[in-house]
Amino acid sequence: MAHRTVGAGISIALTGTATTSAAFKVQSNVLRIVATGGNAYVAIGTDPVATTSDYIVTTQGSESLAMLKMSQRVVGITKGTTTVLAAPEGTTMPFNIGDRVTLDYEGNTKNDSNYTTLINDTKVVGKSRSAGVGGDFEEKVTVEANTAGVSTAFTPAGNATLFMSNKVSVISPNPTAAAVVYIQQVQTTGSA
């Protein structure tokens, strides 16, 4: 099977206690994992803590684990102590309450970078749609980010996208001193 890398890879030192990566934007539905210097038990999610009951990746080869990939373009942001992000009319926000999300401008420099700094691995706490008379047909999510202090208005002209955020947690019951887990989002294609 052929692989194409997506985004930057992550390496985590394996120890006898659970170690969790920084959050990353989910840009692919496959996560390739290689363990060196000791078998690794792996947990993936919004706030994972690996245990020896989780999925095992041995030093004998790599494993490809599935993730849920979700994203949506953002056309509006309502600032406040919590922040409301709107999808284009006629579309939905695929995120659920409890998910974690990250805003990315994907090269767009029209918006204040404070939005991406504050809306980074932030928990979704609400979801709404106000369709109907007096409504706007935009589905919205509310996140825990406090953007009340951002002085610049959000500009929808550009590629502002909200991505699902995940973390990876690993643990090894008997790692060597140089034990490391390498993690990379990949796209897979047919047979190699």
Descriptions of predicted regions:
Residues 4-27, 49-51, 82-91, 111-115:
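Surface-exposed ligand/attachment interfaces on beta-rich extracellular proteins
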Residues 37-53:
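Short, surface-exposed beta-strand/strand-loop-strand elements in extracellular ectodomains
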